[in-house]
UniProtKB/Swiss-Prot annotation:
One GO term of the biological process aspect: L-tryptophan biosynthetic process
Entry-linked PROSITE patterns: IGPS (PS00614)
EC annotation from Swiss-Prot or TrEMBL: 4.1.1.48
Pfam families (alphabetical): IGPS (PF00218)
Catalytic reaction equation(s): 1-(2-carboxyphenylamino)-1-deoxy-D-ribulose 5-phosphate + H(+) = (1S,2R)-1-C-(indol-3-yl)glycerol 3-phosphate + CO2 + H2O
UniProt-recorded name of the protein: Indole-3-glycerol phosphate synthase
Lineage, highest ranks first: Bacteria, Pseudomonadati, Pseudomonadota, Alphaproteobacteria, Hyphomicrobiales
Gene expressing this chain: trpC
Pathway annotation: Amino-acid biosynthesis; L-tryptophan biosynthesis; L-tryptophan from chorismate: step 4/5
HAMAP family registered for this protein in UniProt: IGPS_B
Superkingdom in the source lineage: Bacteria
Cross-referenced PANTHER family: INDOLE-3-GLYCEROL-PHOSPHATE SYNTHASE, TRYPTOPHAN BIOSYNTHESIS PROTEIN
Source species: Rhodopseudomonas palustris (strain BisB5)
Family in the record: Belongs to the TrpC family.
Length: 265
């Protein structure tokens, strides 16, 4: 595991312990049961693909550890609406505060502004966080295979599926892909960013895509900025993408989203 993930795990486990003291699991489970039903995340992506379109998971991200502040005028509902107008299939909302200046309130506000399904983008280490995600309206969660062992990943996946949510299984090498394929979720995200060096290359997706069975939904993550990048990954069968930073930096987010998703004539 990389040094960055070690640091993140340390503060996340402190956060989780504090959250459990503040809001016991039973209370959180009641809130999750009372939450609006999940919107189908995988089904929304597959519907776009069935229409012959790219399927975009558009990310709402204020900052990152590597780039610092990305968008000073940060308005999650307005950004969600812009993404929906631009043709996104789903949202991804950062909820980690120390590294990304995210918050669960941003997830609630963004999802309420649109009809799109939303992913809680965070570092998941405990099933408590899964219930917390559903209680705040999340339709999908992220499992980073590099951060968890097989037993932890399976427990978190089971908790999400039991609550009717979808799961994005994130991998960035062959070994992590093999582990992810042993789980139940059909959605496999290939992170083009090396979590140890922070180097980004689309070659990661190009190398792993042929190893992913056709019944799985492949998602390209990180390093995707232009229509040419989308076309490059589509050539290896990857037509679903998670894009954040490049769109978050644009003044007109809806127009930038439309431009990114426009296939060459």
């Amino acid at each position: 595991m990389s040094d960055i993930l070690n640091k993140i795990e340390a503060y996340k486990r402190e956060e989780i312990a504090a959250a459990k003291r503040e809001r016991p699991l039973a209370a959180l489970q009641a809130a999750a049961r009372a939450a609006p039903p999940p919107r189908g995340f995988v089904s929304a992506l597959r519907a776009k693909l069935a229409d012959g379109d790219y399927a975009l998971i558009a990310e709402i991200k204020k900052a990152s550890p590597s780039k610092g502040l990305i968008r000073p005028d940060f308005d999650p509902p307005a950004l969600a609406k812009a993404y929906q107008q631009g043709g996104a299939a789903c949202l991804s909302v950062l909820t980690d505060t120390p590294s990304f200046q995210g918050h669960l309130d941003y997830l609630v506000a963004a999802r309420a502004a649109v009809s799109l399904p939303a992913l809680r983008k965070d570092f998941m280490y405990d099933t408590y966080q899964v219930v917390e995600a559903r209680a705040h309206g999340a339709d999908c969660i992220l499992i980073i295979m590099a951060a968890l062992d097989d037993s932890e990943a399976r427990d978190i996946e089971d908790a999400a599926l039991d609550l009717g949510m979808d799961v994005l299984l994130e991998v960035h090498n062959h070994a992590e892909l093999d582990r992810a394929l042993a789980l139940r979720s059909p959605m496999i995200g290939v992170n083009n960013r090396n979590l140890r060096t922070f180097e980004v290359t689309l070659a990661t997706s190009e190398a792993l895509a042929p190893l992913i069975p056709s019944d799985r939904l492949m998602v390209g993550e990180s390093g995707i900025f232009t229509p040419d990048d989308l076309a490059r990954l589509a050539r290896v069968g990857m037509s679903t993408f998670l894009v954040g930073e490049s769109l978050m930096r644009q003044q007109d987010v809806a127009a930038a989203t439309r431009t990114l998703l426009a296939r060459a004539a």
